[in-house]
Structures are given as structure tokens and as C-alpha cells.
Amino acid sequence: IQHQHLATELPKLISAYGYKHYILDNNDLDNAITQINDCDENHTICVIKKDTFDKVTLKQEHQLDLSDCIPRGEFLMSINKQFKDTDTLFIGTTGNTAREMYSFMPDTNNFYMAGNMGGALSIGFGAAKAGRKVIVCGGDAEFVMHMGGLTTAGRDANQVNLTYILFDNKQNKSTGGQDTYQSHVDYISIAKASNFSVVENTIESLNEFKYIMTDIKNKSSLKFMCVKCGLDDETPRPPLDIVKVNKF
């Protein structure tokens, strides 16, 4: 929703902060280059309209090989089968995680954090504090956006029924598949230090995932698990009327 409003009001917001701005010229390349150079040399912001640039495929040396990993969609379909028509609340982080949940989890109770990266765990924690059974579906890049949410949830570990699933595909798929450069981050140890009950190993098989999800379905705890996953084909965005839902 923030994208819908920010896109139309961005020039006003820039002016309110006291900056100048250009709308990047998408008809005259020479003028566009002049605008970009001017923005680089002065306190001027360049606003780029949608579809100004064509889609660019990453160079081969920057592409990650995830061919040996199970696509995230298969894990999500497993969740849909296990939690179909239950009152468990699923919070989906922004980007492809939410899009794939919309496509592969049609029978679960989903809340999508569209355009709001890093807040999924905090929203899920709030719902869990209110008495809901919550499962947050996050990603590796999203994990580091608001790590304070981990320690906040960990403080009330005995009072909430909340599971945080981190789907690690090592990239930002929705913005082009760029490497997150987070191979040095030990997600499991960070969650454990924040007082989560953790699955000690990274999940790579569908059978192990199903087994753990069955345990989560039947128990109440503050749980964390990291799932190594691959990529699915592009899936559609959830419709705006679904994204606009503001109640669980």
C-alpha cells in the first residue's frame, strides 16, 4: 500500500524535505544522462517512472546455482496441505515470499506484508500476543532488516505460540536475483541467542520439513527454523483488495 501512495506523492515529499528533483527523461537519452550527472554532483533526487528501464538478466558470474535445492513453492504447498482450513495465521514477508504464498497456499489464513520489508515477525508477534497461533514466512534478506523483533519476541517466549520460518534462497529474487551476501550470517545461532527454540540444522528435505511442521501444528512454543530453498517460476502479486485487508 505504501508504494501506491508514495509513487503518486513522492515529488511532494521530496520538496517538503527541501530538495530539488528531476523526473528522469525516458525520451531523450542525452538529457537523461545530464540529469543523472547533475544529481550525482548536487543535492538533487532523480525520480524514475515505472517501466523506464528494461528488465536486465544478471551476468552469469553473478547468478547463484540453486538447482540442487527444493523450490520454496513445494514447502509452501506442504504447509497448505497440513494447515488447510485451520485458524493458524500466516504472515508473509514482502516480495516473492508473499506472492508465492498467494499462489501455493490458497487454503490457509494469510496476511501479506506487501511493500513492507522487515516487519513480518513484529506483526506476527503482536498477533501471537493477542492469542493467535502464528507462523511467519520470511526470507534471508528480510531477516536482517529488523533483528530487534527477534529479541522482543524472545522476551515473551513462554507467552506466545509463534513460529518463524526463514526461507533462505541467498538472493533478492523479486528485484532481480542479486546475492544477499549473507553467507557469513548464522541465522540459527542468532535466533537461539534471542531465546527462540530452534531447529538446530538447516532444513533441506521436504520430509524433514513436514515432520517438523506436524510438531509445530500440535504444540505451542516460540520456534525458529531455517529452510534452504530454490526458486520457483514467477508468480503473480496478490490482488490489491487482498493486500488492503488490515484485520486478521
Regions found by a protein language model. Name each.
Residues 25-28, 96, 203-208:
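Short beta->alpha linker loops
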Residues 48-53, 94-98, 169-171, 228-233:
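Glycine-rich beta-alpha junction loops
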Residues 58-117:
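Active-site diphosphate/adenylate-binding microenvironment
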Residues 1-7, 15, 32, 73-78, ...:
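Thiamine diphosphate
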Residues 48, 54-63, 239-248:
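YjeF_N-associated NAD(P)HX repair module
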Residues 1-24, 30-39, 45-48, 165:
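N-terminal alpha/beta PP-like core and its mobile active-site loop of ThDP/TPP-dependent enzymes
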Residues 19, 62-64, 195-196:
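Short glycine/proline- and acidic residue-enriched helix-loop micro-motifs
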